[in-house]
């Protein structure tokens, strides 16, 4: 079991959704407060903790201990790590286990893990008995700053990422920054892409701060907590104004139209983590914006330079097995992008840049210039 955590004063970020508002509690050691917070939210509740095998080794026992100390009965559901669980089969396994555990509508599902576990457990909670509340306990940087906030849940289809799902807001998010100490460098760096995204899409001052301080975020301490809290405030603000992604929330998809296609082309495997796909996608979005004359080449280069300095891939050729079927084929990538949730009447919607710190929604983008741009990028030497 992981050594006891050192604590820091928690930071609370409010997701203002009226009677469905909830707190994101950020800090080192806040996992220990899970039980008392759940008991205060829902006296007499029973819980089921959904996690994966890797997270369970480090954080399942401390989670169960916190719940037990508050007198909260719980059961555990452990799935395989990674996108392999974010499938029909994974959803069936978790749903049937929740039914077997007799989780009722007034109980709570607790998602203890990264983005996959949060999406999977949240979707299972959304459909169980037509809706059971859930708590997010994100254990990856990506999940703490992005997927645990805002209520998007779901699974992948063989035809594309996140094509099946529901909006189902958590009732609480516990983001313990100490749990990130157990991530591999590659996992942490992949999550950092989502942190950088908030600066690129809407906060140039934050992006400038990241350029100067990203190495301190990797080390931990106050810089890490500041980056996570700033990211969560940015997302919480957007979600509170546009919960169902009818407008502004689409900006959060910066880098994702390209990125999701690349994830699908690599079979949702560890050849390309989600955050790595976002980093490449964000770079491509900046470069495509420059090609369209929306930003200068210097701005596009600035975005790419920072992502490289943060240890992230930025080129298609950076993907393992780049020459394998589907990845080096512009038409195949276009077909995958055509499955994107933002496609309308066959035309693509992209999040593009007018400046570093100012993203816009570009609707009805014709496929031809995108295809030509991809062919240009695919032709670059490794």
From Swiss-Prot:
State the Gene Ontology terms under molecular function: 3-dehydroquinate synthase activity; metal ion binding; nucleotide binding
Q: Which cofactor does it need?
A: NAD(+); Co(2+); Zn(2+)
The biological pathway it contributes to is:
Metabolic intermediate biosynthesis; chorismate biosynthesis; chorismate from D-erythrose 4-phosphate and phosphoenolpyruvate: step 2/7
The entry's function note states: Catalyzes the conversion of 3-deoxy-D-arabino-heptulosonate 7-phosphate (DAHP) to dehydroquinate (DHQ).
Query: Cofactor: bound how, per the entry note?
Result: Binds 1 divalent metal cation per subunit. Can use either Co(2+) or Zn(2+).
- Superkingdom to which the source organism belongs: Bacteria
The answer to whether keyword Repeat applies is no
Concerning its family, UniProt says: Belongs to the sugar phosphate cyclases superfamily. Dehydroquinate synthase family.
Give the enzyme class.
lyase
Origin organism of this chain? Bradyrhizobium diazoefficiens (strain JCM 10833 / BCRC 13528 / IAM 13628 / NBRC 14792 / USDA 110)
Where does the record say this protein resides? Cytoplasm
User: Which is a Gene Ontology cellular component entry for this protein?
Assistant: cytoplasm
Q: What is this protein called?
A: 3-dehydroquinate synthase
* Alphabetically ordered keywords of this record: Amino-acid biosynthesis, Aromatic amino acid biosynthesis, Cobalt, Cytoplasm, Lyase, Metal-binding, NAD, Nucleotide-binding, Zinc
| Nucleotide-binding as UniProt keyword | yes
User: What GO biological process terms does the UniProt entry carry, in alphabetical order?
Assistant: amino acid biosynthetic process; aromatic amino acid family biosynthetic process; chorismate biosynthetic process
Per the record, the gene is: aroB
Where do the annotations place Zn(2+) binding? Answer: 194, 256, 274
Q: Which residues bind NAD(+)?
A: 81-86, 115-119, 139-140, 152, 161
What EC number(s) has UniProt assigned to this enzyme?
4.2.3.4
> Catalysed reaction per UniProt?
7-phospho-2-dehydro-3-deoxy-D-arabino-heptonate = 3-dehydroquinate + phosphate
Q: Which HAMAP family does this one have? A: DHQ_synthase (MF_00110)
| Any Pfam family hit | DHQS_C
